[in-house]
């Protein structure tokens, strides 16, 4: 699992059908880190700190082992002490 900050919504109207219409968000693991695209399963907004899972756990969290995701948001962090 990773802790990431949601930066913004990603709009992609032309997608493969397997992605469906699930929201996509741009997240960053830490300030200055690489941006990644995550499937949002819970309704996050920019500025939220979230818990993300990757690999096969990301596909399962998105609802199917065949879902084409390698990063899925599974929780919003209410409070934590950032180092």
Q: Model-flagged regions — what are they?
A:
Residues 34-39:
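Short alpha-helix capping/helix-loop boundary micro-motifs
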Residues 51-83:
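C-terminal structural segments of small proteins and small subunits
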């Amino acid at each position: 699992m990773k802790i990431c900050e949601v930066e913004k919504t990603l709009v992609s109207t032309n997608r493969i059908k397997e992605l469906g219409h699930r929201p996509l968000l741009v997240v960053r693991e830490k300030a200055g880190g690489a941006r990644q695209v995550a499937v949002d399963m819970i309704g996050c907004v920019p500025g939220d700190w979230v818990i993300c899972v990757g690999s096969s756990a990301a596909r399962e969290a998105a609802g199917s082992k065949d879902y084409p995701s390698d990063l899925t948001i599974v929780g919003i962090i209410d409070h934590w002490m950032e180092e």
